[in-house]
Amino acid sequence: MPILFDCNATAIQVLRDEASALLESVKQFQEPNDLEAIVKLILKSQEKGGKLVIVGVGKSALVAQKIVASMLSTGNRSAFLHPTEAMHGDLGMVEKNDVILMISYGGESLELLNLVSHLKRLSHKIITFTKSPTSSLSKLGDYYLSLKIKKEACPINTAPTTSTTLTLALGDVLMACLMRAKNFSQEDFASFHPGGLLGKKLFVKVKDLLQTTNLPLIAPSTSFKDALIEMSEKRLGSAILVNDNNELVGVLSDGDVRRALLKGLSLESEVKHFATLKPKSFKNLDALLLEALEFLERHKIQLLVCVDDRNKVLGVLHLHQLLELGLKA
């Protein structure tokens, strides 16, 4: 099927329409509004063990679920409630000190309107996101933020596009205000994302990834040939020279090997003659991975050899392991 329109022009128009709506919405925060009261309400609810329950139907339900996810990831108790399911038992998830946020662009959704009276009966405060404070839903609510837009970005001005983008943005506004009110830090964020990059930077320690077995340990008197075999078998790109007490003597890196070969040294030569003696080592196993990465890059080495206070080898960590985790110094 031939495309009889300019896709790029359409993309530009959609993005401009949505960006324009976001900028237009800034005006509501330059005039008297309920934002600060809403933030205080949610914080007070949290102090009493309550949560933010977000309600929506259709596309608003999907947006509501994203806002819930953002709230949870920043330490704010939150849950999604579908209005239809609420009328058939799920209302039981709403607890005494919870605050309710109801999202409906038009503010006339029957599912939400039917639910409001039950929530009000239970003395819950209602926040509404709708296009007008005079909508049926917002008139029943206690606090309001505007979703007013000039038009949807879709070609026929009907599919939720601009309105859902603005709704997401208002959810971000709430989240950001709560984060600032609670002095939410990078460390706090990482604690909720232990598997993410920030979590790895802030929480995973050297000892958590340290390889302590199958190490390429060799004696200083080992032949160059046998050292190469050990390096090949252990696949760390290096061999570690230790004495009879397992104390670190040197490291044979792939760079050392190349330099030795260029010099034409015999394969039977003892490895101690061309290894790096008294190499850089690392003692703090409680150090974060980022500190280990900075150490490796600062000394321009690839293998972090960890030792104890008596210089005995405990294990290793390779630069590639850290880079594969997405870490950058």
Swiss-Prot record:
Taxonomic placement: Bacteria, Pseudomonadati, Campylobacterota, Epsilonproteobacteria, Campylobacterales
Keywords for the protein's UniProt record, in alphabetical order: ATP-binding, CBS domain, Nucleotide-binding, Repeat
Annotated residues for binding of ATP: 56-61
Family of this protein: Belongs to the SIS family. GutQ/KpsF subfamily.
An MF annotation (GO) of this entry: ATP binding
Family matches, as PROSITE patterns: CBS, SIS
Residue stretches making up the CBS domain: 211-267, 276-329
Pfam family, one: SIS
Protein name: Uncharacterized protein jhp_1324
GO BP term, example: carbohydrate derivative metabolic process
SIS domain location: 38-184
Family matches, as InterPro entries: CBS_dom, CBS_dom_sf, GutQ/KpsF_isomerases, KdsD/KpsF-type, SIS_dom, SIS_dom_sf, SIS_Kpsf
